[in-house]
């Protein structure tokens, strides 16, 4: 095909178009004596129908011989691609300086820079047989439809011509051959090299010898790994003494047409006998080497063996026919055969190192062997992606900047971005993105690109607006998939060109001006300004005024500054406000305008009270908040303006507990709330404006304090020092003790959970998590006898929860005959850490034995003392009865000693004055003979206050021989039953409960006449209550049946009430 530009078509050029649908189109120019190959018209029409649509990415491949003269036509894109000859703009994006493109026809020509296949950088490190490819890109813009440019990718396959002569590395080649060499032995001759490829490379070798060597030597060419290896074959017996060297000529010729040839002198030196040649362990070696390996890194070690001895077996290793690049990068140890790195290895420059290693012995006539070594260079992620940004279509770039009008359509291409990575595999898989929040995105320009080389269109995503953003700095980031990944960035500045698309905009669409009445004419009311986001004349503004009918003739405006003046005096009583319309027009073409409204309010006097937004405020806050914490916020408004609307807030009817911030209306507390002390606060807020005279308003505020879990549960029963007898006959599931506790918090913070935290090694007992009732879960065995100390934990459900701990002593035995032992066990329990179970403790058992001995001694002393005390008491009581004239069985109705709990005891053990949970006392019994009863029992009369009823206190220390007081009262006294209430636990140290009566005389129960206490019966039960004044305690209570404890928060000594 002839060029319309005067160029000539490359005779051997061939076209291959790649794209959907895929097809191949070949054209051949007529050669000497041949005719041009023409396609049938039907096939041509079919190709036009099947040509790839403009929206698809297309690749075109041309095959061109190297060294073509300038202006040689390679191909016509318009004809080959199916575009019309007019209406399109063709632009060469990639391919200079070897190619040029006609902008109208799309014809591709060669340039003054000749395409030399051997000189192209892309083809210098190719493996034999690989094609030499020169890539180019052409953008095609439809000037008629003014659409986005299309990118056409193409390749020039540069075909080799025979322009290089094959040559040997040296004009003289020397071979040393021992004299005892067997006939048929082969000796390799160094290869000749030819820079051409394929058929134009080395094709044949020819040996030329003189008469003396013609019968001794021959040439044999072996095909080895796509190369022809010339070998000298020994055809006769050699005699060094007869002839020690021969000069031969070896000729090499390529396969070009016409062929090229050269020759070299082959000098054969005959050596003395060394009959064994070295032999490599393997005929060939393969190794992998990571690029950028350090100097001295071991690559591979070749090893050969020689059956000779002495110097003939000493092997020396050398490179054989190794290219210069191998000798520069690798080092071969002559003695060990170890190959190490001696230069920087870069896979991107050379991916495979192929060479031979010669092993030669040190004999007089050295023998040698050759092994092939192939080193594959492994890729390392040592190359960051490269990003190239250039213009596309009608958008040109200069100094890294592109100009584009703000009214362009969406998805307009601004630039062509090419991203590539010199690595391979995952290290070359590049991901490219636009960084930052900019209205631009990357769209893939070609679907045929590899992972290591991709092209994108940088296009807009939304309409551009000069008034919002005048320029963009687009940063493009490319990251490969290596480990660790490498990245690079490049940026493009896009300058947005302004068009008059914005109307003037006022600072405020509505401006309200307060202007006093009785003003002077000509005074300035306000200055109204507008702005235009455009630039130049598009932003020059002119102001005008369009007042409402009522304001016509009263106001005027400056066209240049927008200053509004009043022309006459205003009178508020005639009109309170005026509405003015201000127009601002720019000087663009066509002109755009904007409007604003000015409301002129005539000022008035202070005639409005402040007003709270609500008629009353109710806030809820958590207790224990730190002082100066906000508890609520109020809002107050004033219908006036200026100082008349400046409101000051203050707290009324308050003790300094609260303050208020005038700026925010926030109410702050000056104390930390405690709900248990006070749950509600009420006060008033006062608002006063700044008018003259001032106006004020009031509002009520209520603060409700919400509960926080700041109180731990406290144990009301039993005492830590109390105990209970548990006989082996106790039934399973029977309640053996009851733990009671209280919590001064509320809600879930006061919901209690009971659990046994320790002291239950045998699993005999279980506690109700909600009831606190301890029940027997296993049958009592002999090994279970003794004192069991249960550590009961009582926790609430607060977050975080709080807890209290109680000790429950259960004495498993048949009887309580040995009280001294029990008291010793209890003392040991109180001195034992809670994490030790006293039940089954060997040390504890030994203390029991020691207690038994001590009990025996004490029991004897107590028995004697009891007998003496009983005799004295009986005699004394009889004398008292005779003197008082007491008559048994007579009932008195007078209330002698009505118990009243003291004020201090009722407060319990809470330091913050929380509510007491003590039980209410039962109505007391009246007795007529007050003096007789007091003298008979030796009670100490104590009174809480002048108005309190007298209270009877039992003596705290009884002699060991004290009589059975229950039997004495039953037979000789008309007193009602006496109840002793078990003492509740104390928050301090250890607590003891006074046992006032001997074990044999103790009655346990609620006053039932059938209840038993040891061997005796009594009509009277007892109950202990805390006294107002503390006393010393010396005893411990015990019970034979299930107790019914009455919880009480008081601590101290026991006081007894006489009730009926």
From Swiss-Prot:
Gene Ontology, cellular component aspect: cell junction; cell-cell junction; intracellular membrane-bounded organelle; nucleolus; nucleoplasm; plasma membrane
Biased composition (Polar residues): 1003-1024, 1033-1043
GO BP: any one term: homophilic cell adhesion via plasma membrane adhesion molecules
One Pfam family recorded for the sequence: Cadherin_2
InterPro entries, per the entry: Cadherin-like_dom, Cadherin-like_sf, Cadherin_CS, Cadherin_N, Protocadherin, Protocadherin/Cadherin-CA
Compositionally biased spans, kind Low complexity: 973-986
All copies of domain Cadherin, residue ranges: 58-168, 169-280, 281-387, 396-506, 507-612, 613-715, 718-844
Membrane-spanning ranges: 853-873
Region of interest: Disordered: 884-1045
Signal peptide, first to last residue: 1-57
GO terms of molecular function: calcium ion binding
Tissue: Highly expressed in the brain and neuro-glial cells.
Annotated membrane topology: Single-pass type I membrane protein
Intervals, Extracellular compartment: 58-852
Residues bearing PTM Phosphoserine: 918, 949, 962, 984
Chain intervals with Basic residues compositional bias: 907-920
Subcellular location: Cell junction; Cell membrane
Glycosylated residue positions: 305, 403, 618, 662, 813, 818
Record key words, sorted: Calcium, Cell adhesion, Cell junction, Cell membrane, Glycoprotein, Membrane, Phosphoprotein, Repeat, Signal, Transmembrane, Transmembrane helix
Positions with biased composition (Basic and acidic residues): 884-897
Cytoplasmic side: 874-1060
Function: May be involved in cell-cell interaction processes and in cell adhesion.
Descriptive protein name: Protocadherin-1
Species: Homo sapiens (Human)
Gene: PCDH1
